[in-house]
């Protein structure tokens, strides 16, 4: 008596193989879609968090600009707000900002904000340079602390506008011909455009960014977010 051996025919094997291949391909495709979507969410969350945190700190420092301690051991603070328009050397003409304020009778602070390029790259970040003078006696005030740091990564544009009490732009504002205009500044507007670190779109996307007096187009696979804050410089108003 012969036993019947059960098995799969060649056609059945081929059908099973095809179905398995399709299933694996479908799972791989679904994973890619999910992964790209997840990475996009992570990138956007990172941009939003870094932008909000940076603007919060920047706003606090702008509120201090121009504060003069009446017992300051250095010469009275007369130059405290400076801006350079459309700094060259970048993809986009960004601004550069410098502020001063007294921290105590013995201490004075200077902070510079401007775009810088990463090494061997055209991409830019917003840098923050911090200088801290500490006086040991009258007019003997060496820099005790100096910090140059990456304030926000992947910043494409940084724009500053100074407004007077009628809402009109004040310019120039610097330590030369625009020195007298420091007193006219009643609000400081900051525009900051941050780009994602990685590409997140499958196809290029058109962008048109409008920040203060700066407008520029982009066509790529990155996402972006622009942040804005308007600050009341209370110490300038009191000067």
Model-derived regions: residue spans:
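Residue-level detector of alpha-helix boundaries and kinks
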Residues: 42-43, 140, 216
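Short linear sequence signals and composition-biased patches located at protein termini or domain-edge surfaces
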Residues: 46, 147-239
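Surface-exposed loop/linker segments characteristic of extracytoplasmic
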Residues: 77-166, 187, 224, 228
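Aliphatic-rich helix starts adjacent to a transmembrane/signal segment
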Residues: 2-69
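Short, glycine/acidic-rich hinge or "gate" loops at secondary-structure transitions
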Residues: 71-77
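Short, aromatic- and cysteine-enriched interfacial helices/patches
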Residues: 1-2, 81
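Short amphipathic alpha-helical segments
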Residues: 71, 94, 132-134, 232-239
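Residue-level marker of positions within ordered structural domains that often coincide
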Residues: 32, 63, 67, 104, ...
């Amino acid at each position: 008596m012969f036993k019947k051996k059960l098995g799969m025919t060649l056609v059945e094997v081929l059908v099973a193989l095809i179905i398995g291949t399709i299933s694996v391909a479908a799972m791989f495709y679904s994973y890619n879609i999910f992964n790209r979507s997840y990475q996009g969410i992570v990138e956007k969350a990172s941009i939003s968090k870094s932008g909000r945190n940076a603007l919060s700190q920047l706003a606090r420092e702008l509120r201090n600009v121009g504060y003069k301690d009446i017992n300051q051991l250095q010469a009275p603070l007369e130059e405290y707000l400076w801006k350079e328009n459309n700094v060259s050397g970048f993809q986009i003409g960004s601004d550069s900002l410098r502020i001063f304020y007294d921290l105590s009778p013995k201490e004075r602070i200077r902070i510079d904000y401007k775009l810088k390029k990463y090494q061997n790259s055209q991409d830019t970040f917003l840098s923050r340079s911090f200088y801290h003078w500490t006086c040991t006696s009258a007019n003997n005030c060496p820099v005790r602390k100096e910090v140059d740091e990456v304030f926000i990564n992947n910043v494409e544009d940084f724009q500053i506008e100074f407004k007077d009490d009628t809402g009109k732009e004040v310019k120039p504002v610097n330590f030369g011909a625009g020195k007298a205009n420091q007193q006219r500044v009643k609000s400081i507007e900051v525009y900051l455009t941050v780009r994602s670190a990685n590409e997140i779109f499958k196809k290029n996307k058109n962008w048109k960014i409008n920040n203060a007096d700066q407008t520029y187009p982009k066509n790529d696979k990155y996402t972006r977010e622009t942040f804005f804050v308007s600050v009341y410089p209370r110490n300038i108003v009191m000067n």
